Amino acid sequence: KNIVPSLDSITASERTSKIAEIIPKGNFVKDKSTIRLEALGAKGAYGSTIISTELSLGNLVVRAPQGDFPANTNGTVTATAKITDSRGRTASKSIQLNVIDYYAPKILAFIANRAGNGTNKTVISTVLANVSPLIINGSNINRYNLKIQYSEKGTNRWIDAVNLSNETTEIINRQINSGAFYALDKPYNLRLVIQDRISDLADSVILIRSSEVLIALGDGRIGFGGFPELKNQIEF
């Protein structure tokens, strides 16, 4: 006779809703997923009762029929449910989970200059950044958006100059024409924004000076090498 307790199954589900919406069941994301394990259908045998349930994921253990675990490693991970009855007999079930390696978007460098040796309305940006792929069944599902926005200095009104969507390149190293929106006599803030499907956005802000000239005069201002930004000042 079978006098050991029985356990129907162990299940794993994603508790982070943003990830659950895009990642197929049974897959999780390192450092982003919260994995819920649950032991289902635990029963004693011949009058015994279940006195403990232990859930484990790697070296992490929760002593309960249900528990949440961080996804702190990548690769194939074993999840196990173990039950013990009132006679001290045990039963267990295990499943394999796939935890995908991931890192948040990283902006390594963002440089922008006016074209024509600093004398043009057109701005050319150089972007160096990394965006982690999420490879499932051979396909990268972590598409991201890359924006370059500009704002006249002191206004904090951001306008899109570049808007690239559904990008998948992991290592970004490119020059991007950021438009001819930049009046010669005004400085601008330029903002790079990268948003993937998992993390909060990454951004970087830099200053684009007014156009480079030998000397500029007017309205109580004098500028050498660029248009002056402050009244009653001499700027270099």
Give, region by region, the residue ranges found by the protein language model.
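Short, solvent-exposed loop/turn segments at the edges of extracellular beta-sandwich modules
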Residues: 83-89, 195-201
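Low-complexity, small-hydrophobic/phenylalanine-enriched stretches
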Residues: 213-236
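Surface-exposed, short loops/turns at beta-strand junctions within beta-sandwich domains
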Residues: 67-77, 173-187
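Hydrophobic/tyrosine-rich beta-strand signature of extracellular beta-sandwich/beta-rich modules
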Residues: 79-81, 192
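Acidic, Ser/Thr
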Residues: 33-47, 126-139
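Short, solvent-exposed loop/linker segments at the N-terminal edge
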Residues: 11-34, 113-124
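Extracellular interdomain linker/stem segments of modular secreted and single-pass surface proteins
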Residues: 1-8, 98-107, 209-219
